[in-house]
């Protein structure tokens, strides 16, 4: 099956939290025989911060938007499946509508949402939102997470079906390595500074650092320059994918903090959770509904509802216990949460549905109702 993808970036994780997800999904689909073309815009400095990885499993097209979009759409229409990811970052509204023109007796079109809470909030905030009327026209809607709340929401908006394809582990890229003294710390957090994350980073990570000056904290990610930090917090800037393992294996514990929108919806384990699991790191996460669907709290993952609970864990979980928890989490991830399993799930969904164009009568009726 030939698959043409529009996404933010496969080649760069710079200001692009979906990079690990894209790589895991498309590399493993390629291993199942899918032929992947991934089109990403030259935007946000990502091409100046490309990761040093092997992307030979996909034909990567770097384009200028909107100039190159008509040419790309012509190529896309020759594929068996066209995927438009949310959050491409440039001309999203144009692409969301334009890809639907590729639908034919041979070509199906999917919308793959990598930030469903933000997408759905945008739709609900504006009754005239252009994407709302397009949802029923896609052959498939996939989401990066969100579980039952997101599935039900998309179905209410007219989606034919909604399939969560959760983040996972790629054991070929995220695995245990020797500790690196330059990243040694008691607690590490890696995440870009974003509007609906910053307050939670202050509430969980920075407040815990303030309360425990005897411990060392490591902060990675873009945007934190100029942010007042406690003296025991060291900021290291953008963390390339190749450094994930060294950080995760050098910290006594690693912290995951979901963005506010993701935490409120639940069922959205981010890439950082599985990156840490692959390295066998001891992970503390903020609480969100659905955690137990992925890992067992207290046995495979630690859960903290506020900074006080984080400081309690820092004081009570020694290096030996941290290693044991990390090893348990890694075993569970390898058994149930790999990208090879997610790719099989996608293939099964695609094979259950035969190609076809949305019935014109159905389309016209929905547009009248919308």
Regions found by a protein language model. Give the residues of each.
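Nucleotide-sugar donor-binding catalytic core of glycosyltransferases
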Residues: 2-5, 9, 21, 34-40, ...
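Catalytic binding pocket for nucleotide-activated donors in carbohydrate/polymer assembly enzymes
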Residues: 7-12, 21-24, 37-62, 156, ...
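Short amphipathic alpha-helix
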Residues: 18-29, 203-204, 346
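Conserved nucleotide-cofactor-binding alpha/beta core module
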Residues: 47-50, 67, 126-127, 131
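An amphipathic, basic-hydrophobic alpha-helix
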Residues: 62-81, 89-91
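Short, acidic/turn-prone active-site loops that include or flank metal/cofactor-
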Residues: 65-67, 115-116, 167-170, 307-308
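Short acidic active-site motifs
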Residues: 68-72, 130, 242-243, 309
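Active-site proximal beta-strand in glycosyltransferases
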Residues: 100-119, 140
């Amino acid at each position: 099956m030939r698959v043409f993808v529009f996404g933010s970036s496969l080649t760069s994780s710079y200001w692009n939290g979906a990079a690990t997800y894209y790589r895991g999904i498309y590399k493993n689909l390629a291993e199942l025989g899918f032929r992947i073309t991934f089109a990403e815009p030259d935007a946000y400095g990502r091409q100046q911060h490309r990761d040093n990885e092997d992307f030979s499993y996909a034909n990567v097209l770097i384009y200028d938007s909107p100039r190159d979009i008509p040419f790309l759409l012509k190529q896309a229409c020759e594929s068996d499946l066209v995927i438009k990811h949310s959050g491409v970052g440039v001309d999203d509204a144009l692409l969301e509508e334009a890809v639907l023109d590729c639908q034919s007796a041979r070509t199906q079109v999917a919308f793959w949402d990598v930030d469903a809470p933000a997408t759905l909030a945008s739709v609900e905030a504006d009754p005239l939102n252009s994407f709302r009327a397009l949802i029923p026209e896609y052959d498939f809607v996939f989401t990066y997470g969100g579980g039952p709340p997101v599935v039900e929401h998309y179905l209410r908006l007219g989606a034919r079906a909604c399939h969560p394809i959760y983040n996972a582990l790629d054991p070929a890229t995220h695995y245990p390595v020797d500790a690196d003294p330059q990243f040694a710390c008691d607690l590490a957090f890696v995440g870009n500074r974003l509007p609906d994350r910053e307050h939670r980073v202050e509430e969980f990570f920075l407040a815990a650092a303030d309360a425990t000056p005897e411990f060392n904290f490591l902060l990675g990610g873009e945007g934190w320059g100029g942010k007042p930090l406690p003296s025991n917090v060291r900021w290291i800037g953008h963390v390339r994918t190749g450094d994930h393992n060294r950080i995760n294996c050098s910290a006594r514990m690693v912290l995951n903090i979901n963005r506010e929108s993701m935490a409120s919806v639940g069922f959205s384990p981010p890439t950082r959770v599985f990156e840490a699991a692959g390295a066998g790191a001891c992970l503390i996460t903020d609480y969100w509904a659905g955690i137990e669907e992925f890992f067992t709290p207290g046995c495979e993952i630690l859960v903290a509802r506020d900074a006080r609970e984080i400081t309690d864990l820092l004081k009570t979980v020694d290096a030996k216990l941290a290693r044991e928890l990390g090893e348990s989490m890694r075993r569970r991830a390898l058994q149930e949460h790999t990208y090879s399993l997610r790719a099989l799930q996608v293939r099964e969904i695609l094979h259950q549905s035969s190609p076809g164009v949305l019935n014109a009568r159905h389309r016209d009726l929905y547009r009248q109702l919308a």
